[in-house]
């Protein structure tokens, strides 16, 4: 009788441990997406910035001449950042387009140090030369640091690199070797 009770307690504990681990993994959508395709890059489109494109008087150095995040976009970026920080995935490098909406998104994620990279800049309205952006991005993708790199960019750049169209705040895990993609969201 005692052996049956011990065995039953063991089996019940095993079920709860397995169930708990499954729930924890299901809630860590970032790690699940990266693991699903052995991704070495995660692209993220900047958080919500209402409108399309940028004003005609756009200048890279002046955020007042650009389409920027609104309060909903700021909240979205902060929520996504909280999910990333809760995740088991740690980024070896975090890069952002030089556009203000991408830099603000990256800052609001609340991650460690990050830097801008012109190979992530938008070529939607020809404020950046598409061929130059794609060439810089491809060189970077061919020479990544070990680990997983986060790249905060624009819909046109992410689509050019991965073939995936993304909404504001959406992410695409990308395996640079196999070219596999896995689109997901964290908000």
Residue map of PLM features:
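Generic beta-sheet signal
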Residues: 39-42, 147-153
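Sec/Tat signal peptide C-region and signal peptidase I cleavage site
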Residues: 22-26
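Glycine-rich phosphate-binding loop signature in dinucleotide/nucleotide-binding domains
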Residues: 87-89, 143-147
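Sec-dependent N-terminal signal peptides
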Residues: 10-20
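Active-site-proximal alpha-helix that buttresses catalytic centers in soluble enzyme cores
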Residues: 27-126, 164-187
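All-alpha RGS (Regulator of G-protein Signaling) helical domain and cognate RGS-like helical scaffolds
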Residues: 117-123, 127-134, 138-141
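Positively charged n-region of N-terminal signal peptides that target proteins for export
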Residues: 1-11
């Amino acid at each position: 009788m005692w052996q049956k009770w011990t065995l039953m307690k063991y089996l019940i504990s095993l079920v709860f441990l397995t169930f708990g681990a499954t729930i924890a993994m299901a809630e860590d959508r970032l790690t699940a997406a990266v693991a699903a395709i052995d991704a070495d890059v995660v692209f993220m489109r900047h958080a919500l910035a209402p409108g399309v494109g940028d004003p005609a008087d756009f200048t890279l150095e002046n955020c007042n001449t650009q389409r920027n995040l609104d309060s909903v976009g700021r909240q979205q970026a902060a929520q996504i950042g909280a999910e990333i920080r809760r995740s088991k995935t740690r980024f070896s490098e975090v890069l952002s387009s030089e556009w203000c909406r991408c830099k603000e998104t990256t800052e609001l994620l609340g991650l460690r140090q990050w830097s801008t990279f012109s190979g992530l800049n938008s070529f939607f309205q020809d404020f950046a030369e598409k061929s130059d952006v794609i060439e810089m991005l491809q060189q970077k993708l061919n020479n990544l640091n070990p680990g997983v790199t986060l790249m905060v960019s624009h819909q046109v750049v992410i689509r050019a690199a991965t073939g995936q169209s993304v909404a504001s705040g959406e992410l695409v895990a990308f395996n640079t070797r196999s070219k596999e993609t896995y689109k997901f969201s964290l908000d």
